[in-house]
């Protein structure tokens, strides 16, 4: 709660520091070079460059992912048994330990899923291309590949952050292997859904006339 409060307190300042100038970046064909193994891989690289190229987008889209990694890392310094000992006598700790792990696993599953779902870069990826969106229409790739790459990148970084988070939870024994697998699979399934819905809305009602990347990020 303290970490969330601190980050929220300085969120506006962080956005101001990482905001780009009010001039949209121009995409070039170099970003989708045909030197990649396949056109789809090239599109994925282009999407990654787009997200990392706008610090404000990177921070806002990955806020939930970064928060989960930070919380999981901090949890490594506390054992489940020591936490249970705060609520029950020491002699009763072994008895309540399985229940504590079950509760902890449920909390990490649902809270983690909500945080990872907030990392929905696909929902603004079409509008983010701005006035250079015509460039994609000139490339020898299908619309399915273009939009598929946007969703693939969204799921890729969620997968990476989710796996790292579960490793941090597993090291001190807060969760079981089964819970860790659930904590990876469930967010990916829901992220796939919200990414498709978000991208569909963005394609249906794009905003190519934005002047500040913060405007499009806050959609």
Annotate each PLM feature.
Residues 1-134, 142-219:
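Hydrophobic alpha-helical transmembrane segments of membrane proteins
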